[in-house]
């Protein structure tokens, strides 16, 4: 009786395992785009209290402007590129005390673990700020060959 396929040998299994293990860091290294991934999170969870409307703005903090993110404040710098644990934004969204955590616990919309990890990864990758797509100058694409 013929076997339709040969069982995986130890070396084939080892090669497959190594391939999977080596591909995981490559997936984690995917750059996080501020405009596509971070700004929508902020818009959904933060801009209500820290956005354009000065009458509703809390803490004198406006998160829709780049200047606010990178200049030192009395409490600390909102984002220290490459250092989430030194970034006030990250320490506030991961704070263990519910009274100090952002968004406040009474807000219906809370950050998900995936959103928190995206913010962490964005900071780790250098916190590259990209303007809203509507402010990016149009470029003519290259002609096809």
Positions of the model-derived regions?
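Aromatic- and Gly/Pro-enriched helix-to-coil junctions and flexible linker segments
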Residues: 25-145
